[in-house]
């Protein structure tokens, strides 16, 4: 089963960022982006699999570029904070044979960090 997951942590509060809406987009060989789906992070700040149900059944991810779009402005508003980045977009390249991609986001009102997780 293939999957793309994320974990959003609020580094200012030192806790998971629950309720951040994450949209997943895909661009294959044509280069045109299409939305695959969107969901909010759970109480632990996680989206266990952003892929649509039919794509989860594949053993590996479709090669190409994937973009995770985090709606951070609405999250910061729930914390009564004005953030600098209303949206955080992270674009990654998936190569042939990758089955799982985990993209954590460490978030604060005035900055963010990401890395390839496991």
Each model region followed by its residue ranges:
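Compositionally biased low-complexity segments at domain edges in trafficked proteins
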Residues: 98-118
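Beta-strand-dominated extracellular/periplasmic modules and repeats
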Residues: 2-91, 95, 102-104
């Amino acid at each position: 089963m293939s999957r793309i997951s994320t974990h959003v942590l609020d580094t200012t509060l030192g806790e998971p960022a629950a309720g951040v809406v994450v949209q997943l987009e895909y661009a294959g060989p044509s280069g045109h982006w299409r939305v695959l789906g969107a969901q909010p992070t759970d109480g632990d700040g996680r989206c266990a699999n952003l892929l649509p149900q039919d794509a989860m059944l594949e053993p590996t991810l479709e090669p190409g570029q994937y973009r995770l779009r985090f709606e951070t402005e609405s999250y910061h508003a729930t914390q009564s904070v004005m953030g600098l980045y209303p949206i955080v977009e992270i674009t990654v390249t998936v190569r042939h044979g990758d089955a799982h991609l985990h993209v954590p986001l460490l978030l604060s009102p005035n900055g963010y960090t990401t890395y390839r997780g496991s």
